[in-house]
Design a protein with these regions (language model features):
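Glycine- and small/polar-enriched repetitive beta-structure motifs of secreted/surface proteins
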Residues: 1-262
Length: 262
């Protein structure tokens, strides 16, 4: 019953309130089968693609472009998604950008795993970027730590980052290898921090930097700097190390407080 809506496609903008006063949202655009089909009072949302924004009830200022993008987001606002199944499982996240196929796919879920459904202020760009971000295996993770204020850019970048905020991850398969929790870290470069499981407040810049380093407070700059000498779990757990230069400190395992330059 709202005004200034444009709906094109079977069940597009159908409305989730099936009795009076029906669905009163306005200024919405939905194009595609079941796009924005459940809306009630939401407004200023654009959903283009098969089941795009399908579950949105009263969110606003969202843009969903791509088949099933933002499909489960019921009450979130200020989200931008572009790509097949981008932001697919999120139910209430807001002010998030997901660009690329399956970017930020698992923001929430069900089954034997405990998932966080309120993930905010994330930018994920790339194929499968941040795919598992926000899905937290029960019992073994800091449940109170939200996946907020993260930036992940690149093919499979941050794909296995489950929890923790204020991270910057840029590069093909950076921070992607084992389920991980990290906070306040920067990983830039191909496979940088690829197997980090729990380290926080690290800086790793350069291809393969900190690839097998799971400790905290490390700084690695340069090709393969601080890669880590233990290449299988539990990997290299040394902390508070600084390595600058080509393959500097590349073989460290449990070292603490080392500085290697050159």
């Amino acid at each position: 019953t709202g005004s200034y809506n444009t709906f094109v496609g079977t069940s597009a903008g159908k409305g989730g309130t099936t009795s009076a006063p029906f669905s009163s949202g306005g200024n919405n655009t939905a194009v595609g089968y079941q796009a924005l089909t459940a809306f009630t009072v939401g407004d200023h949302t654009t959903a283009i693609g098969y089941q795009a924004g399908k579950a949105q009830v009263d969110g606003y200022d969202n843009t969903y472009i791509g088949a099933r993008s933002g499909q489960a987001n019921a009450v979130g606002d200020g989200n931008v998604t572009l790509g097949d199944r981008a932001l697919y499982s999120d139910t209430s996240g807001h002010r998030t950008i997901a660009i690329g196929k399956d970017a930020l796919h698992f923001f929430s879920g069900s089954g034997t795993t405990d998932f966080q459904s309120d993930i905010t202020k994330i930018i994920a760009i790339g194929y499968f970027a941040g795919y598992n971000m926000g899905s937290v295996p029960g019992g073994s993770w800091p449940q109170a730590t939200r996946s907020t204020n993260n930036i992940v850019i690149g093919y499979y970048a941050g794909n296995t980052h489950y929890a923790g905020g204020s991270n910057v991850v840029i590069g093909t398969e950076a921070l992607n290898g084992v389920p991980n929790y990290t906070q306040g870290s920067v990983y830039i470069g191909e496979s940088s921090g690829q197997n980090v499981s729990s380290g926080s407040y690290n800086v790793a810049i350069g291809a393969y930097t900190g690839r097998y380093a799971t400790g905290s407070y490390n700084t690695f700059v340069g090709y393969k700097a601080g890669t880590g000498g233990t290449t299988s779990a539990p990997f290299s757990s040394g902390t508070s190390n600084t390595a600058v230069g080509y393959e500097a400190l590349t073989g460290f395992t449990t070292g603490y407080g080392n500085t290697a330059v050159g």
